[in-house]
Protein backbone atom coordinates (compact mmCIF):
# COMPACT_ATOMS: atom_id res chain seq x y z
CA UNK A 1 0.00 0.00 0.00
CA UNK A 2 1.43 3.37 -1.01
CA UNK A 3 1.99 6.00 1.66
CA UNK A 4 -0.07 9.22 1.32
CA UNK A 5 1.83 11.96 -0.48
CA UNK A 6 1.42 14.55 2.25
CA UNK A 7 4.21 16.86 1.12
CA UNK A 8 2.99 16.96 -2.49
CA UNK A 9 -0.58 17.66 -1.40
CA UNK A 10 0.53 20.47 0.89
CA UNK A 11 2.60 21.94 -1.90
CA UNK A 12 -0.36 21.82 -4.28
CA UNK A 13 -2.58 23.55 -1.74
CA UNK A 14 0.04 26.21 -1.16
CA UNK A 15 0.36 26.79 -4.90
CA UNK A 16 -3.40 27.12 -5.32
CA UNK A 17 -3.62 29.55 -2.40
CA UNK A 18 -0.74 31.60 -3.73
CA UNK A 19 -2.34 31.71 -7.16
CA UNK A 20 -5.68 32.76 -5.70
CA UNK A 21 -3.98 35.46 -3.65
CA UNK A 22 -2.22 36.79 -6.75
CA UNK A 23 -5.50 36.89 -8.67
CA UNK A 24 -7.07 38.73 -5.74
CA UNK A 25 -4.22 41.23 -5.69
CA UNK A 26 -4.55 41.87 -9.41
CA UNK A 27 -8.29 42.37 -9.05
CA UNK A 28 -7.71 44.73 -6.13
CA UNK A 29 -5.14 46.63 -8.14
CA UNK A 30 -7.53 47.01 -11.05
CA UNK A 31 -10.25 48.21 -8.70
CA UNK A 32 -7.87 50.63 -7.05
CA UNK A 33 -6.75 51.92 -10.43
CA UNK A 34 -10.35 52.47 -11.48
CA UNK A 35 -11.11 54.28 -8.23
CA UNK A 36 -8.02 56.45 -8.63
CA UNK A 37 -9.06 57.27 -12.19
CA UNK A 38 -12.57 58.25 -11.10
CA UNK A 39 -11.20 60.30 -8.21
CA UNK A 40 -8.92 62.17 -10.59
CA UNK A 41 -11.83 62.84 -12.96
CA UNK A 42 -13.88 64.17 -10.06
CA UNK A 43 -11.09 66.49 -8.96
CA UNK A 44 -10.49 67.83 -12.46
CA UNK A 45 -14.21 68.34 -13.03
CA UNK A 46 -14.64 70.38 -9.85
CA UNK A 47 -11.51 72.43 -10.53
CA UNK A 48 -12.70 73.13 -14.07
CA UNK A 49 -16.18 74.15 -12.93
CA UNK A 50 -14.89 76.41 -10.16
CA UNK A 51 -12.36 78.01 -12.51
CA UNK A 52 -15.05 78.54 -15.12
CA UNK A 53 -17.45 80.16 -12.65
CA UNK A 54 -14.70 82.47 -11.41
CA UNK A 55 -13.90 83.50 -14.98
CA UNK A 56 -17.48 83.83 -16.20
CA UNK A 57 -18.40 86.27 -13.43
CA UNK A 58 -14.97 87.82 -12.79
CA UNK A 59 -15.22 86.70 -9.17
CA UNK A 60 -11.55 87.07 -8.25
CA UNK A 61 -9.22 89.79 -9.53
CA UNK A 62 -5.55 90.55 -9.16
CA UNK A 63 -4.75 91.80 -5.67
CA UNK A 64 -7.97 90.55 -4.08
CA UNK A 65 -8.11 89.34 -0.52
CA UNK A 66 -10.71 86.58 -0.47
CA UNK A 67 -12.41 85.85 2.83
CA UNK A 68 -13.45 82.19 2.63
CA UNK A 69 -16.34 81.56 5.01
CA UNK A 70 -15.65 78.18 6.56
CA UNK A 71 -18.51 76.55 8.46
CA UNK A 72 -16.98 73.11 8.87
CA UNK A 73 -19.33 71.55 6.32
CA UNK A 74 -18.36 69.71 3.16
CA UNK A 75 -19.10 72.62 0.83
CA UNK A 76 -16.94 75.25 2.50
CA UNK A 77 -14.08 72.78 3.01
CA UNK A 78 -14.16 71.90 -0.69
CA UNK A 79 -14.33 75.57 -1.68
CA UNK A 80 -11.25 76.42 0.37
CA UNK A 81 -9.37 73.38 -0.91
CA UNK A 82 -10.08 74.12 -4.58
CA UNK A 83 -9.35 77.85 -4.26
CA UNK A 84 -5.97 77.04 -2.74
CA UNK A 85 -5.17 74.72 -5.64
CA UNK A 86 -6.33 77.25 -8.23
CA UNK A 87 -4.25 79.98 -6.62
CA UNK A 88 -1.10 77.91 -7.18
CA UNK A 89 -1.66 78.01 -10.94
CA UNK A 90 -3.58 81.25 -11.40
CA UNK A 91 -2.15 84.01 -13.63
CA UNK A 92 -3.12 86.53 -10.95
CA UNK A 93 -2.12 87.07 -7.33
CA UNK A 94 -4.71 86.98 -4.58
CA UNK A 95 -4.73 86.24 -0.86
CA UNK A 96 -6.96 83.87 1.07
CA UNK A 97 -8.05 84.11 4.68
CA UNK A 98 -10.42 81.58 6.21
CA UNK A 99 -13.06 82.83 8.64
CA UNK A 100 -15.28 80.78 10.90
CA UNK A 101 -18.16 82.15 12.93
CA UNK A 102 -18.37 80.21 16.19
CA UNK A 103 -22.04 80.62 17.07
CA UNK A 104 -21.64 78.87 20.43
CA UNK A 105 -23.78 75.90 19.56
CA UNK A 106 -23.81 73.23 22.28
CA UNK A 107 -21.19 70.60 21.57
CA UNK A 108 -19.45 72.59 18.84
CA UNK A 109 -15.87 71.23 18.59
CA UNK A 110 -13.93 74.49 18.79
CA UNK A 111 -10.56 72.83 18.18
CA UNK A 112 -11.32 71.21 14.81
CA UNK A 113 -11.06 74.17 12.44
CA UNK A 114 -8.05 75.89 14.06
CA UNK A 115 -6.15 72.60 14.02
CA UNK A 116 -7.07 71.88 10.40
CA UNK A 117 -6.24 75.38 9.15
CA UNK A 118 -2.96 75.45 11.06
CA UNK A 119 -2.04 72.07 9.57
CA UNK A 120 -2.60 73.23 5.96
CA UNK A 121 -0.99 76.62 6.60
CA UNK A 122 -3.94 78.91 5.86
CA UNK A 123 -4.32 82.23 7.74
CA UNK A 124 -7.58 82.24 9.65
CA UNK A 125 -9.79 84.15 12.03
CA UNK A 126 -12.33 82.67 14.44
CA UNK A 127 -15.16 85.08 15.26
CA UNK A 128 -16.90 84.20 18.53
CA UNK A 129 -20.52 85.38 18.66
CA UNK A 130 -23.31 83.69 20.62
CA UNK A 131 -25.98 83.86 17.92
CA UNK A 132 -27.26 80.44 19.01
CA UNK A 133 -28.78 81.84 22.22
CA UNK A 134 -30.30 84.77 20.35
CA UNK A 135 -31.94 82.49 17.79
CA UNK A 136 -33.27 80.10 20.42
CA UNK A 137 -34.65 82.98 22.48
CA UNK A 138 -36.41 84.76 19.61
CA UNK A 139 -37.66 81.88 17.46
CA UNK A 140 -40.69 79.94 18.80
CA UNK A 141 -40.27 76.22 19.37
CA UNK A 142 -40.86 74.24 16.20
CA UNK A 143 -40.27 77.18 13.87
CA UNK A 144 -37.35 77.31 11.47
CA UNK A 145 -34.31 79.23 12.65
CA UNK A 146 -32.76 79.62 9.20
CA UNK A 147 -33.98 83.13 8.36
CA UNK A 148 -32.92 84.83 11.59
CA UNK A 149 -29.71 82.83 11.84
CA UNK A 150 -28.66 83.77 8.30
CA UNK A 151 -29.38 87.47 8.88
CA UNK A 152 -27.32 87.53 12.06
CA UNK A 153 -24.51 85.59 10.46
CA UNK A 154 -24.50 87.79 7.36
CA UNK A 155 -24.19 90.99 9.35
CA UNK A 156 -21.32 89.63 11.42
CA UNK A 157 -19.43 88.35 8.37
CA UNK A 158 -19.79 91.70 6.60
CA UNK A 159 -18.29 93.45 9.61
CA UNK A 160 -15.44 90.95 9.89
CA UNK A 161 -14.65 91.33 6.19
CA UNK A 162 -14.17 95.05 6.70
CA UNK A 163 -11.98 94.52 9.74
CA UNK A 164 -9.78 92.05 7.86
CA UNK A 165 -9.55 94.18 4.72
CA UNK A 166 -11.18 91.50 2.57
CA UNK A 167 -12.29 92.58 -0.90
CA UNK A 168 -14.37 89.47 -1.64
CA UNK A 169 -16.48 87.21 0.59
CA UNK A 170 -16.62 83.63 -0.69
CA UNK A 171 -19.61 81.46 0.25
CA UNK A 172 -19.92 77.72 -0.39
CA UNK A 173 -23.28 77.57 -2.16
CA UNK A 174 -23.38 75.08 -5.06
CA UNK A 175 -25.57 74.35 -8.09
CA UNK A 176 -28.21 72.53 -6.07
CA UNK A 177 -28.48 75.41 -3.58
CA UNK A 178 -29.11 77.80 -6.46
CA UNK A 179 -31.83 75.65 -8.02
CA UNK A 180 -33.40 75.07 -4.60
CA UNK A 181 -33.58 78.82 -4.06
CA UNK A 182 -35.21 79.29 -7.46
CA UNK A 183 -37.87 76.70 -6.64
CA UNK A 184 -38.47 78.08 -3.15
CA UNK A 185 -39.04 81.58 -4.51
CA UNK A 186 -41.36 80.26 -7.22
CA UNK A 187 -43.39 77.91 -5.01
CA UNK A 188 -43.60 80.01 -1.85
CA UNK A 189 -42.70 83.57 -2.86
CA UNK A 190 -44.21 84.00 -6.30
CA UNK A 191 -40.90 85.26 -7.70
CA UNK A 192 -38.46 84.25 -10.42
CA UNK A 193 -35.48 84.80 -8.18
CA UNK A 194 -32.46 82.63 -7.61
CA UNK A 195 -29.09 82.93 -5.91
CA UNK A 196 -26.54 84.88 -8.00
CA UNK A 197 -22.92 83.74 -8.34
CA UNK A 198 -21.79 87.28 -7.52
CA UNK A 199 -23.56 90.18 -5.84
CA UNK A 200 -23.07 93.34 -3.87
CA UNK A 201 -23.81 92.91 -0.18
CA UNK A 202 -26.77 94.53 1.56
CA UNK A 203 -24.57 97.23 3.06
CA UNK A 204 -23.02 98.09 -0.31
CA UNK A 205 -19.53 97.62 1.09
CA UNK A 206 -18.78 94.03 0.11
CA UNK A 207 -18.83 91.76 -2.92
CA UNK A 208 -20.06 88.22 -2.27
CA UNK A 209 -18.98 85.40 -4.59
CA UNK A 210 -20.03 81.76 -4.92
CA UNK A 211 -17.17 79.87 -6.62
CA UNK A 212 -19.02 76.52 -6.35
CA UNK A 213 -21.99 77.81 -8.37
CA UNK A 214 -21.48 75.27 -11.19
CA UNK A 215 -20.70 72.26 -8.97
CA UNK A 216 -23.24 69.55 -8.13
CA UNK A 217 -23.75 68.66 -4.49
CA UNK A 218 -23.21 64.95 -5.15
CA UNK A 219 -19.74 65.75 -6.50
CA UNK A 220 -18.95 67.74 -3.37
CA UNK A 221 -20.09 64.85 -1.18
CA UNK A 222 -17.74 62.48 -3.01
CA UNK A 223 -14.90 64.98 -2.88
CA UNK A 224 -15.30 65.57 0.86
CA UNK A 225 -15.18 61.82 1.44
CA UNK A 226 -12.12 61.50 -0.77
CA UNK A 227 -10.27 64.33 0.97
CA UNK A 228 -11.42 63.20 4.44
CA UNK A 229 -12.32 66.67 5.65
CA UNK A 230 -13.07 66.90 9.40
CA UNK A 231 -16.78 67.62 8.94
CA UNK A 232 -18.64 69.49 11.69
CA UNK A 233 -22.44 68.95 11.74
CA UNK A 234 -24.81 71.90 12.16
CA UNK A 235 -27.22 71.55 15.08
CA UNK A 236 -29.19 74.70 14.28
CA UNK A 237 -30.70 73.95 10.89
CA UNK A 238 -29.66 70.51 9.66
CA UNK A 239 -31.54 68.67 12.40
CA UNK A 240 -34.82 70.55 11.99
CA UNK A 241 -37.55 68.51 10.27
CA UNK A 242 -39.97 69.68 7.58
CA UNK A 243 -37.85 72.49 6.21
CA UNK A 244 -39.03 73.69 2.81
CA UNK A 245 -35.45 73.71 1.56
CA UNK A 246 -35.09 70.06 2.54
CA UNK A 247 -38.18 69.32 0.46
CA UNK A 248 -36.64 71.09 -2.54
CA UNK A 249 -33.41 69.17 -2.04
CA UNK A 250 -35.24 65.86 -2.07
CA UNK A 251 -37.17 66.93 -5.18
CA UNK A 252 -33.97 67.83 -7.03
CA UNK A 253 -32.32 64.55 -6.07
CA UNK A 254 -35.34 62.65 -7.37
CA UNK A 255 -35.33 64.56 -10.65
CA UNK A 256 -31.61 63.94 -11.11
CA UNK A 257 -32.23 60.21 -10.79
CA UNK A 258 -35.42 59.91 -12.85
CA UNK A 259 -34.89 62.65 -15.41
CA UNK A 260 -31.15 63.18 -16.10
CA UNK A 261 -30.52 66.66 -17.42
CA UNK A 262 -33.67 68.28 -16.02
CA UNK A 263 -31.96 70.06 -13.13
CA UNK A 264 -29.05 71.10 -15.36
CA UNK A 265 -31.51 72.65 -17.82
CA UNK A 266 -33.25 74.51 -15.00
CA UNK A 267 -29.90 75.81 -13.84
CA UNK A 268 -28.86 76.85 -17.35
CA UNK A 269 -32.20 78.63 -17.80
CA UNK A 270 -31.15 81.12 -15.14
CA UNK A 271 -28.57 82.50 -17.60
CA UNK A 272 -30.84 82.32 -20.66
CA UNK A 273 -33.65 84.71 -19.82
CA UNK A 274 -35.95 86.25 -22.45
CA UNK A 275 -37.71 89.19 -20.72
CA UNK A 276 -40.05 89.77 -23.69
CA UNK A 277 -41.57 86.36 -23.06
CA UNK A 278 -42.18 86.80 -19.37
CA UNK A 279 -44.61 89.18 -17.67
CA UNK A 280 -42.46 91.66 -15.74
CA UNK A 281 -43.22 95.17 -17.01
CA UNK A 282 -40.08 96.51 -15.32
CA UNK A 283 -37.93 94.30 -17.54
CA UNK A 284 -39.75 94.80 -20.84
CA UNK A 285 -41.88 97.77 -22.09
CA UNK A 286 -45.06 95.85 -22.88
CA UNK A 287 -47.25 98.96 -22.56
CA UNK A 288 -45.40 100.83 -25.32
CA UNK A 289 -45.05 97.82 -27.62
CA UNK A 290 -46.31 98.54 -31.15
CA UNK A 291 -46.13 96.84 -34.54
CA UNK A 292 -43.10 98.24 -36.36
CA UNK A 293 -43.55 96.54 -39.71
CA UNK A 294 -40.14 94.93 -39.29
CA UNK A 295 -39.45 91.26 -38.61
CA UNK A 296 -38.50 90.48 -35.04
CA UNK A 297 -36.45 87.33 -34.42
CA UNK A 298 -37.86 87.24 -30.90
CA UNK A 299 -41.46 87.58 -32.05
CA UNK A 300 -43.89 84.79 -32.97
CA UNK A 301 -41.04 82.55 -34.06
CA UNK A 302 -40.11 82.24 -30.41
CA UNK A 303 -43.21 80.08 -29.93
CA UNK A 304 -41.98 77.47 -32.39
CA UNK A 305 -40.78 74.19 -30.99
CA UNK A 306 -37.06 74.16 -30.30
CA UNK A 307 -34.90 71.04 -30.02
CA UNK A 308 -34.81 69.85 -26.44
CA UNK A 309 -31.48 69.48 -24.71
CA UNK A 310 -30.34 65.89 -24.43
CA UNK A 311 -29.14 66.24 -20.86
CA UNK A 312 -25.57 65.46 -21.89
CA UNK A 313 -24.52 69.09 -22.21
CA UNK A 314 -21.89 70.19 -19.74
CA UNK A 315 -21.67 73.84 -20.76
CA UNK A 316 -22.13 76.50 -18.14
CA UNK A 317 -25.11 78.87 -18.15
CA UNK A 318 -25.08 81.02 -21.27
CA UNK A 319 -22.70 78.66 -23.05
CA UNK A 320 -19.69 80.28 -21.42
CA UNK A 321 -16.29 78.79 -22.08
CA UNK A 322 -13.76 77.79 -19.41
CA UNK A 323 -11.25 80.40 -18.35
CA UNK A 324 -7.50 80.00 -18.46
CA UNK A 325 -7.00 80.41 -14.75
CA UNK A 326 -5.42 76.98 -14.57
CA UNK A 327 -3.76 74.55 -16.97
CA UNK A 328 -5.85 71.49 -16.37
CA UNK A 329 -3.49 69.12 -18.22
CA UNK A 330 -0.94 69.62 -15.46
CA UNK A 331 -3.24 68.48 -12.65
Swiss-Prot record:
List of residues binding [4Fe-4S] cluster: 146, 149, 237
Catalytic activity field: cytidine(32) in tRNA + S-sulfanyl-L-cysteinyl-[cysteine desulfurase] + AH2 + ATP = 2-thiocytidine(32) in tRNA + L-cysteinyl-[cysteine desulfurase] + A + AMP + diphosphate + H(+)
EC class of the enzyme, as a word: transferase
Keyword Protein transport: no
Main location (coarse class): cytoplasm
GO MF annotations, alphabetized: 4 iron, 4 sulfur cluster binding; ATP binding; magnesium ion binding; sulfurtransferase activity; tRNA binding
Cofactor(s) of this protein: Mg(2+); [4Fe-4S] cluster
One BP annotation, GO: tRNA thio-modification
Top-level taxonomic group: Bacteria
EC number: 2.8.1.-
Pathway(s) of this molecule: tRNA modification
Record CDD domains: TtcA-like
Cofactor remark from the record: Binds 1 [4Fe-4S] cluster per subunit. The cluster is chelated by three Cys residues, the fourth Fe has a free coordination site that may bind a sulfur atom transferred from the persulfide of IscS.
Subcellular location: Cytoplasm
Chain positions of motif PP-loop motif: 71-76
Keyword Disulfide bond listed: no
Coiled coil ranges: none
Gene Ontology cellular component annotations, sorted alphabetically: cytoplasm
Keywords: 4Fe-4S, ATP-binding, Cytoplasm, Iron, Iron-sulfur, Magnesium, Metal-binding, Nucleotide-binding, RNA-binding, Transferase, tRNA processing, tRNA-binding
Pfam name, any one: ATP_bind_3
Subunit relationships: Homodimer.
Note: The thiolation reaction likely consists of two steps: a first activation step by ATP to form an adenylated intermediate of the target base of tRNA, and a second nucleophilic substitution step of the sulfur (S) atom supplied by the hydrosulfide attached to the Fe-S cluster.
Protein task: Catalyzes the ATP-dependent 2-thiolation of cytidine in position 32 of tRNA, to form 2-thiocytidine (s(2)C32). The sulfur atoms are provided by the cysteine/cysteine desulfurase (IscS) system.
Family in the record: Belongs to the TtcA family.
Protein name in UniProt: tRNA-cytidine(32) 2-sulfurtransferase
Organism: Burkholderia multivorans (strain ATCC 17616 / 249)
Amino acid sequence: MNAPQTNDTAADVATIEASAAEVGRRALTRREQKEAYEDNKLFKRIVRQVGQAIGDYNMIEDGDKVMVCLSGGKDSYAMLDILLRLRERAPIDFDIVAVNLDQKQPGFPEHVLPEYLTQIGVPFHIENQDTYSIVKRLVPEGKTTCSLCSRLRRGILYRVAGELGATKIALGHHRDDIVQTLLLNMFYGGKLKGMPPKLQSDDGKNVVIRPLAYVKETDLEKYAELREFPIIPCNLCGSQPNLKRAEMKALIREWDKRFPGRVDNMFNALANVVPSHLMDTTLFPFASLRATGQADPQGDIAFDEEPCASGDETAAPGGAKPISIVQFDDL
